[in-house]
Amino acid sequence: MYEGKKTKNMFLTRALEKILADKEVKKAHHSQLRKACEVALEEIKAETEKQSPPHGEAKAGSSTLPPVKSKTNFIEADKYFLPFELACQSKCPRIVSTSLDCLQKLIAYGHLTGNAPDSTTPGKKLIDRIIETICGCFQGPQTDEGVQLQIIKALLTAVTSQHIEIHEGTVLQAVRTCYNIYLASKNLINQTTAKATLTQMLNVIFARMENQALQEAKQMEKERHRQHHHLLQSPVSHHEPESPQLRYLPPQTVDHIPQEHEGDLDPQTNDVDKSLQDDTEPENGSDISSAENEQTEADQATAAETLSKNDILYDGENHDCEEKPQDIVQSIVEEMVNIVVGDTGERTTINVSADGNNGTIEDGSDSENIQANGIPGTPISVAYTPSLPDDRLSVSSNDTQESGNSSGPSPGAKFSHILQKDAFLVFRSLCKLSMKPLSDGPPDPKSHELRSKILSLQLLLSILQNAGPIFGTNEMFINAIKQYLCVALSKNGVSSVPEVFELSLSIFLTLLSNFKTHLKMQIEVFFKEIFLYILETSTSSFDHKWMVIQTLTRICADAQSVVDIYVNYDCDLNAANIFERLVNDLSKIAQGRGSQELGMSNVQELSLRKKGLECLVSILKCMVEWSKDQYVNPNSQTTLGQEKPSEQETSEMKHPETINRYGSLNSLESTSSSGIGSYSTQMSGTDNPEQFEVLKQQKEIIEQGIDLFTKKPKRGIQYLQEQGMLGTTPEDIAQFLHQEERLDSTQVGEFLGDNDKFNKEVMYAYVDQHDFSGKDFVSALRMFLEGFRLPGEAQKIDRLMEKFAARYLECNQGQTLFASADTAYVLAYSIIMLTTDLHSPQVKNKMTKEQYIKMNRGINDSKDLPEEYLSAIYNEIAGKKISMKETKELTIPAKSSKQNVASEKQRRLLYNLEMEQMAKTAKALMEAVSHVQAPFTSATHLEHVRPMFKLAWTPFLAAFSVGLQDCDDTEVASLCLEGIRCAIRIACIFSIQLERDAYVQALARFTLLTVSSGITEMKQKNIDTIKTLITVAHTDGNYLGNSWHEILKCISQLELAQLIGTGVKPRYISGTVRGREGSLTGAKDQAPDEFVGLGLVGGNVDWKQIASIQESIGETSSQSVVVAVDRIFTGSTRLDGNAIVDFVRWLCAVSMDELLSTTHPRMFSLQKIVEISYYNMGRIRLQWSRIWEVIGDHFNKVGCNPNEDVAIFAVDSLRQLSMKFLEKGELANFRFQKDFLRPFEHIMKRNRSPTIRDMVVRCIAQMVNSQAANIRSGWKNIFSVFHLAASDQDESIVELAFQTTGHIVTLVFEKHFPATIDSFQDAVKCLSEFACNAAFPDTSMEAIRLIRHCAKYVSDRPQAFKEYTSDDMNVAPEDRVWVRGWFPILFELSCIINRCKLDVRTRGLTVMFEIMKTYGYTYEKHWWQDLFRIVFRIFDNMKLPEQQTEKAEWMTTTCNHALYAICDVFTQYLEVLSDVLLDDIFAQLYWCVQQDNEQLARSGTNCLENVVILNGEKFTLEIWDKTCNCTLDIFKTTIPHALLTWRPISGETAPPTPSPVSENQLDTISQKSVDIHDSIQPRSADNRQQAPLASVSTVNEEISKIKPTAKFPEQKLFAALLIKCVVQLELIQTIDNIVFFPATSRKEDAENLAAAQRDAVDFDVRVDTQDQGMYRFLTSQQLFKLLDCLLESHRFAKAFNSNNEQRTALWKAGFKGKSKPNLLKQETSSLACGLRILFRMYTDESRASAWEEVQQRLLNVCSEALSYFLTLTSESHREAWTNLLLLFLTKVLKISDNRFKAHASFYYPLLCEIMQFDLIPELRAVLRRFFLRIGVVFQISQPPEQELGINKQ
């Protein structure tokens, strides 16, 4: 303690002694000073003695600590100060210096704190007086330089010292003094020191304010831990030990700043700054001590974390605060948010500060700040969004309530406000200083005004750059920025002084970085009125443009800013389209447009262009950066053999090297240089891209409507109504005209003045929406005319004024001035005339006041208006004209012609005028928006980039295209290329196809590779373009889609160029060049092929030119280019599934173009296709199959290329790829091999070249031989190719294909059967095709043998088929053997039968039935149904050959054969087939007998007989019914009715005999008549089977005998009739055979005859048919049915044979040869068969029930037969009946006597008649016996002995 005091005393003593010792002090005028020093010295001495400590405590206090204060100390300090005060007031610099030096040290070491009240001025502290004294030492420029320096030091110490506190006016005074020293001092060192001091002071003032908030935040954190149950209890600040003297200052000292301190800093004007009080009152509210202090606690808490961040960002201070505050603040904010949001509803006491809406404004900004600085990991925005405006209110109310209960307000909180006020005052003063106008004329760099302006701006910049969170968020400062700083900037931002202008720009940049969320409107004004205006106006100077564009470079490099500008302005209905305009302006600058008028040098123009390009590229880079999360780098992953990596993996996999490969494309180097990107701030709810897009669309509609309105108002309004943006009522439209400021005012006037009814309604509504209440007439008129320009026509003005007057009176009904509306109307008109007269330059003689008054005489209902009234109007108009609304042009002023700007000087003058106007506008606008609170959205979504890019892609493209086109500067080119790269990236990421394609096409165009004359002009920039294009392909391949076409086209051309560059002859396809060699070798002046190929040169060549071309494109062959191109193809494995398909698709397209070139087809791309196929084969199969779909299709086309070399290359490549692909094998049920090998099929199908076909077959054969074990689904294609080869006519192709097929069927099937099952059908089909190739019969037979071999596989391995699953899952497992095995084999055999020549088809038929017979036992019932559907196709009439002879042969051979085979199979598998097949067989037989083929017809009946005889025993009743019905049907359809009805057509050829034929002759002829059936060979049991093999039908011979003269239709008819006759007879025979077994009847007849010859009486010659015939299986009804058929047939034959006339006619017409036709055999055999059946039934005991009917039928039939016999005239006819009669008589003789009686009595007379004929002996013998029996039975006579006992039953 003692030591401290001692130090202090030592200082004081020395200083006082030094002052006393000064010789000046000795002078009289310093007596007071001298005395004060002496008194002070004495006191010090006395005090020292009094307080000297006892011995032991000498070291008790640390000498470094300031002493503890007590009341006495204050008084002492006061005493000590007086001598220094007097010393400072002395005029002697030395004394002043000494005094200042001592004060500075005392303050520095804490010995002088000045905390005591000032005894001279109540309400102030001593320290204020001390500072005032120090400041007073500066007396202006004449002050001693040493003193100046001491003042600066003392003030800096005072402001920065830890030990004293100075506030408000005192701080201002200290700052002002330093400022003035800087301006006034002539000494450069002093100036520099003053400036540095100012900077440091400001740093301290603002840093203190921020630190205090941080302390408070820490304090609150402690408090929070201490009291968990409350959100905030009034925190008692426990201050740190190093500042124990902090005290709470009464509120009034804070609130009310005494006026003498408020002067501005500028020395020239020390006026009192009154505005301070007005400003600060509402901002701080009435009671800062309670409510507001606490209200800011939250601000400080929330701001603390940002403080640490910002310090790091700005100047690296406060590193120690970096970590803890973050954690502290995080927890505070989190809890606060949760509780506040929860409690909002309950808190009602809201303390709103004096200006009423302060609460809400402040709240908005604060809560927004909390969100902005939202701590990572806490969902603050979620918690905060619901009630932004209320949150802060509730916090403040909560604080207020609690502070009432607490023991006393916390000093810390109050103190913080004083610090804020200090900062605020300094900031505001600097703003005001910067606004001071400069003197007119060219600015003088040394003038105080300019230096002051520059210094103030520099200091403001420094404050802003180092601003902490309180400054950035506190309402007071934000308002200060809006009201003072922005207005100041709007004045300085157009300064012609470069330094001022530049500083303004820097300040603007800082504002944009750190404060943009609060300054939405201000930023808009800045861009619109200053930046863009300077860029757009042609007169602005290069320097200005340059500085603006430099600034823009900074802005454009920050992604957050760029996106924010778009979201907040372009997507805001009421804001200008700043982003769009910015891009357009930059694009124009980058294109070098408009530089002519600027008078710029070329160098300047180029540097400006580069800057413009740089900005554009920066913007695009930002957009890339912003959307980088959407981009997947193809090179950081591979698509081979794995799925896409997950989101996490992808982000981890973006290795630094891949990211940095393209500078800042994946991640721009740094965006937070300005701190913009460091945190996002949010005000208006959430950032919803869709919502903004909708707004943008609406805005575009409105803008379009406004454009249309400018051209034609009605059209504009109609458009907006159609788009739903404007209502239809006049009121809606009027409101729109009021509110929409962008409308052209002239057009608005025209529209309102129009005489149209609707327009008038709108005009009335428009005027009615004005409220003129309480306004004087002129003000009302001014207000009315502000909205539009009056139209020119008097009538229109008339209407408007009339309505205006009416509305004015309506609003001001209490006025007494105007008698009526008419008065107002006339007066309004006169005012407009007056304004025109007084202010129009065209009017030379201006109207005087008297004239004006005179003009208005008598207008008030014939009275005058008061003269003084009119006089006042005149004066007002003369002073200020009525200005109508001007239309503000946003567009760039039209290019001023050369005359306008004759010289640079004039241009400058014009520009300065423009700048002044601009400054006025900007200032006015700035002031207008200074109180507007506009919500600012901080963009966070990457989706915004899409609409941004869509909006601006054209100006970007224009700038880059023009740059590349017309400028050879490498930097320009590299910027353009980089820009295009970024643009492509964005278009890619968001898949905006049109734009992407446009950029890629532009890039491709500038490679000059695709232009016909391109390569000759190739420069470095074109080479770079090629490299860029390749890079794009490498980095953006996943997104390129159709743009691959351009890229691959260029790469294809590049290869050609490289060949020329290296002088290598391109490898054309030999075939085409061969033809041209002859013509080329002769002419030595002609260019080599490749030059012609590229379209480089015409016929004759300048070889020098070629050399230079080779040189210029040599660069394209550089290793780096070659490798890069190669990398595109090798890297194709990394493209994703869709991208690789696009890539391949366009590679194929380019390859196609190369190959289609008429002059020089090339195979570059084709080779690349093969390469990428190799690379990508490892992809997952799903992707690979999509790739191959495209490549395979390409191979299809290339393999069919007319140029054989191309096709050979394609097929060979296919072979190699296939081999590799097959090595991979294939799992069951996949079909990739099938897809892969399909091109072989296609080529085989379409390419007719034997060479290629042979090659395809060889390739496939090679695959089979080497890869058989791996082939699965590929077998299908292999068989398909062989199938196509099988029908070839070239022996070697067929031979090789068949050999291989045979190898597969015999060996491969054996080993790998399960793998081949899927293509088993194809194999069989293929063999069938070989069998059907008529050119190679041996192969055909061998093929059928192999099919038979296949059947063995099916039989041996049914399980394999059952287990095989495939596409046809709907096939039941048990049916798979059939569907995939048996059916194909049998079907193909049926195809062979249907397609081949006789010997092959016969073999096929044999094998087919052989298979059925061999393996049929394994077949299911429904399989047989399918099978016979195939088999019966053999008989399908539609499929039979057309030619008659072939058809006949077919029927005679194949059908015949098949029919017998079917019956055999049926018999073999009767049990299964009876239900299945019988109906079909009957139907088929029925079909056979209907064909015009005798052989087939016979076979049909024959087969019917076989089937029934062989299987009848097993037939059911139902089947017998079917059998009988079938027989019946055949019978009915084959009765040749036409024989009876046929009539010769008139004009029939005459009979062969020319002479008329007499009856006798006819009769003799009739006796020789020919039986139609004579030609039929008798059927014996043995020859039945051979019948089918009879080569040609006998009927055919008969047909040929038919008269050649007969007409063809008749010939056909007769042939058919003949066949029907044959069938009838066959059928009778069949029935006989079925019922009684074949040959039985014939034997019986023979025996009957023999017996008759012997005249034997032994009637036991009964042939036993019991065992064999089917008689016993037929029911009586069925037998009767058959009988009916037989008898009908018999009757028909009888009718025909009796019809002599008809027979003659037929004979004459050529039917049946030389003699008349008859049907004797049919007549007799049908009856014979009928009789046998009836007699058999008659004697059958089991049919006793039918005997009665049988007897009746017998009697009728027999009597009818006998009667008919008696009518026969012809000998031969009677002879035919011999056997019949024998049969009849024999049978009757054998019946019992009873029955015999009945019969004999019935036939007796007829038999008597018969005896008159000349009968043969046998018949006579039987008749004799018959009559004898009659005698005995009727007991007429006794029987002879040998006959006794016979038939007595």
Curated annotation (Swiss-Prot):
Subcellular location: Cytoplasm; Cytoplasm, Perinuclear region; Golgi apparatus; Golgi apparatus, trans-Golgi network
CC per GO annotation: cytosol; Golgi membrane; nuclear matrix; nucleolus; perinuclear region of cytoplasm; small nuclear ribonucleoprotein complex; trans-Golgi network
Post-translational modification: Phosphorylated. In vitro phosphorylated by PKA reducing its GEF activity and dephosphorylated by phosphatase PP1.
Residue segments, region HUS: 557-577
PROSITE patterns: SEC7
GO biological process: endomembrane system organization; Golgi organization; negative regulation of actin filament polymerization; negative regulation of GTPase activity; positive regulation of wound healing; protein glycosylation; protein transport; regulation of ARF protein signal transduction
Motif (Nuclear localization signal (NLS)): 711-715
Keywords of the record: Cytoplasm, Golgi apparatus, Guanine-nucleotide releasing factor, Membrane, Nucleus, Phosphoprotein, Protein transport, Transport
Compositional bias per record (Low complexity), positions renumbered to this chain: 664-684
Biased composition range(s): Polar residues: 350-360, 394-409
Listed Basic and acidic residues bias regions: 46-58, 644-658
Tissue expr: Abundantly expressed in kidney, somewhat less abundant in lung, spleen, and brain, and still less abundant in heart.
Coiled-coil ranges from the UniProt annotation: none
Tree of life domain: Eukaryota
Example of a GO MF term: protein kinase A regulatory subunit binding
Subunit structure comment from the entry: Homodimer. Interacts with ARFGEF2/BIG2; both proteins are probably part of the same or very similar macromolecular complexes. Interacts with FKBP2. Interacts with MYO9B. Interacts with PRKAR1A and PRKAR2A. Interacts with PPP1CC. Interacts with NCL, FBL, NUP62 and U3 small nucleolar RNA. Interacts with DPY30. Interacts with PDE3A. Interacts with KANK1. Interacts with TBC1D22A and TBC1D22B.
Main function: Promotes guanine-nucleotide exchange on ARF1 and ARF3. Promotes the activation of ARF1/ARF3 through replacement of GDP with GTP. Involved in vesicular trafficking. Required for the maintenance of Golgi structure; the function may be independent of its GEF activity. Required for the maturation of integrin beta-1 in the Golgi. Involved in the establishment and persistence of cell polarity during directed cell movement in wound healing. Proposed to act as A kinase-anchoring protein (AKAP) and may mediate crosstalk between Arf and PKA pathways.
Protein name, per record: Brefeldin A-inhibited guanine nucleotide-exchange protein 1
Organism for this UniProt entry: Bos taurus
Lineage: Eukaryota, Metazoa, Chordata, Craniata, Vertebrata
